[in-house]
């Protein structure tokens, strides 16, 4: 049988170090120097949009799925344009003297004067302008600053030996003055809670300047002349903490730059690694247990996905605790859909590195399993299948009973997408090989749910998928299938007998009550109409034979091009869209693409 083929299990690979060691001191613990630069990340295969589960194991050095810039999903109807609104923005301390003098071009100045001119331009770009209350003010000087930033970006990209020791404090100061600021309050602080799946983000009004500042600093970090030994005097813990605070920005373009910059710093400054991980943990703890609101969780998880990929084996206790105490509780937050692909990637990376963590992870997922949120339940099923794709048979035997009890509940779900997603597990060859090896324990758990729903589920598609699962079980072990059928029949008969005994007992109690002289005084009102059970009748022998014939004739052979249902994004109404926001997000160029294009131009 095709599902009998075992998946080739490879030992987890440790990502190679691509960061050049610096003398800034190693982060203790014998951990690999994780890659300093996130590789250009291809568009991922979304979890809920993949082919029917296959047995191909994901390579352990794959990149984490990138965060989507725009989460707005359009329906087929006409787009409703939103009226302009006053744009919120960060709280900048505007410079008093905003009159800038245009300085000579760097390329036209004598070589010996370029360093001093470069410093003058960096200081000139520390002047902050008003983009909110009076966007049309100081247009001439805003253009001078924009042109200066643009020129410095080109200069540091295409020139060599320009990042001298005197440039480091000036570049870090310019970045800090422009970027480290008080973020605006929530878009709608007094009204309904901000919904990241529906509400459009507030874009930063000062982005024309901020974007160039980010681009300059990223090129500064990427420059071949950059020396972490010198930079560590200025890029310290205080700088990193201020950088992490910016991840709560609503503007996804800003978070995209921050993600790349923080990852570069993590790779180049070994002495800051433990501090960065600790501060990210604190952000997650506040998010889980206090605020349940933070805009940058997906980006932080994306960074951690690359970091986890580079952890040395065996894993340190600190890293295991991070998985159990931080990553697993992140599953219970209401806004899980915003960052779930990145979270699932991190979890699977841990299990690929150390299979002994599988049991606590699956037990934790079952603990946080959603009870009333069906789209979230589909996400859990997606992640659980990814975990089963890399699970060791010895670990599977430890968790299969609680795992399949939960799957039986999912198969019985009235929400057809939950039931459908659970039944797709039976098209995964590796999962079927695990089930085949443990059929005596799995089939008795699953059979009642499959049989009951093959007759009672309201959705016809589910019937076909159930028949397919039953057929696979029948082919796997005919005798065990017959035993489960007879056991199910016997259990139903016992249940019916117990129900009859209970009814007879109540009738006796009622008869005794009627003998009481005071019975007319306390007689209950007329009884309610009888409650009819939705359960099917006890299966007869004819039912059993009919089940076998039906399974043989109606089992659906899953086609390879059937796609899983996408994780639902709640679209409560056709909301008006802000055209400016949509165009701005579409025009944004990701930091990885930006760096790749500049390297090709060299």
From Swiss-Prot:
Gene: PPP2R5D
Disease: Houge-Janssens syndrome 1: An autosomal dominant disorder characterized by global developmental delay, hypotonia, variably impaired intellectual development, poor speech, and dysmorphic facial features. Additional more variable features may include macrocephaly and seizures.
Sequence motif SH3-binding, location on chain: 523-530
Organism of this sequence: Homo sapiens
Keyword tags: Cytoplasm, Disease variant, Intellectual disability, Nucleus, Phosphoprotein, Repeat
Molecular-function annotations in GO: protein phosphatase activator activity; protein phosphatase regulator activity
SUPFAM superfamilies noted in UniProt: ARM repeat
Tissue specificity comment: Isoform Delta-2 is widely expressed. Isoform Delta-1 is highly expressed in brain.
Induction record: By retinoic acid; in neuroblastoma cell lines.
Protein name as it appears in the record: Serine/threonine-protein phosphatase 2A 56 kDa regulatory subunit delta isoform
Domain of life: Eukaryota
Segments of skewed composition (Low complexity): 46-55
Phosphoserine modification, residue list: 88-90, 573, 598
Region (8 X 2 AA approximate tandem repeats of Q-P): 37-52
